[in-house]
Amino acid sequence: GVASITFRGNQLISGVAINFLASGLTVLIGQRWFELGGRTPQLVEGGRFAPIQLPFAEALAPVPIIGPIWSELISGHTILVYVALALVPVTWWVLYRTRFGLRLRAVGENPAAVDTAGVSVSGMRYAAVAICGVLCGLAGAYLATGLAAGFVKEMSAGRGYIALAALIIAKWRPWQALGTTLLFGLLEAL
């Protein structure tokens, strides 16, 4: 955020540089703290987020079509998956139904107009970076505790770039981004 907001650096170059820095720094910190070659110790079963079985998942399992969809596709994920899905309508509501969302979208589209209205462009951009950091932290927590049992070098395997591609394809809209990411997830699962 500082590189592109305060120092007005190119966002693409800053983003790639931060990714390279984070990739090396996480391994270095992991090596110093745990001395396991840049990995973390495996989490014990109680340290991971357990899958949640939704109501009627077992009862509906034998029902054709609906059963497999409910019991295998929708049920059995960790709490972080359901939180992420619940955040899609919340994100849409904040972006399209609140003053903060209007200002946030305006900062991206026309920062001069926002500045003329007396709103701090830098402040709004830093708020966006902070919110993005929280959401990316949720994604990282899922990778480290839900998908795997600890940190391993390059464990994201480019998923951040895939998420960025999904966002661009969805034209920065939350509901379309959900559909695009579900499509990408389906294609990855095949």
PLM region spans:
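Helix-loop interface residues and adjacent transmembrane-helix termini in multi-pass membrane transporters
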Residues: 6-8, 123, 171
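Transmembrane alpha-helical segments in multi-pass inner-membrane proteins
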Residues: 136, 146-190
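Transmembrane helix-bundle core of multi-pass membrane transporters
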Residues: 23-96
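Helix-loop-helix "hairpin" substructures at the membrane interface of multi-pass membrane proteins
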Residues: 72-151, 174-180
